[in-house]
Amino acid sequence: MKKLILTAAVALFAFTANAQDGAATGSFAKSDLFVSGTLGFSSTSQGDAKTSGFEFSPSVGYFLTDNIALEFGLGFGSDKAVNDDKTTTVGVDLGARYFFTPASQFSFTVGAGFEYQTATTSFDAGGDDLKVNAFGFAVSPGVNYFVSDAFALRASIGALSYTSTKQDVSGADASNSFGLNLDLTDINFGLTYKF
């Protein structure tokens, strides 16, 4: 079912892009500056265990060439469990995104970037907070679609990633992971404004 929804969404994007070829639409070019952001909410429940989450990730980007944009972003997140344990995440990332058809209203993209995050969990039962630091690299495919001359919708789906995670305590060992995820469990939507 998820694959059917994804296929329908991609087909709708492609159809809309072709249907509006004659209309005035936005596009990207060398030296363009833009701001972008994603906003996410989540809620998971399994029996009595419930978790809710919120994430906000603003970024700023600049086109170095007609096809390549450099992006710098921040990330803020918060997850809360039913027992009132709370995890707060703060991160920064730096990356580049390649636009296959930047002068068009619709473009497939592929992005790659580095990210550093710090997550702090405070426990409702008391005790010391748990702090975890993570560094990672990811490559992800996506799409960009201009809905006006300045505003564009963007989406990225999944990632090929490497992450190294380590608790912020003396003597802790790092945990390294490598993954490939190209399904709807890792999809991000955002809005872009081009100056």
Regions found by a protein language model. Give the residues of each.
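Predominantly the C-terminal beta-signal and adjacent terminal strand-loop region
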Residues: 23-24, 78-82, 142, 147-195
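Residues that define the transmembrane beta-barrel architecture of outer-membrane proteins
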Residues: 31-33, 50-56, 86-92, 106, ...
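Repeated loop/turn-to-beta-strand initiation elements of outer-membrane beta-barrel proteins
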Residues: 67-70, 104-106, 145, 150-153
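Residues on the lipid-exposed face of transmembrane beta-strands in outer-membrane beta-barrel proteins
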Residues: 37-41, 58-62, 74-76, 92-98, ...
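Mid-chain, structured segments of secreted extracytoplasmic proteins
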Residues: 66, 71-102
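Short glycine/proline- and aromatic-enriched beta-strand/turn motifs that initiate or cap beta-hairpins
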Residues: 20-66, 70-73, 186-195
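Outer-membrane beta-barrel translocator domains and adjoining extracellular loop/strand segments
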Residues: 45-54, 80-90, 119-133, 165-175
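Outer-membrane beta-barrel biogenesis signature
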Residues: 4-11, 15-36, 98-101
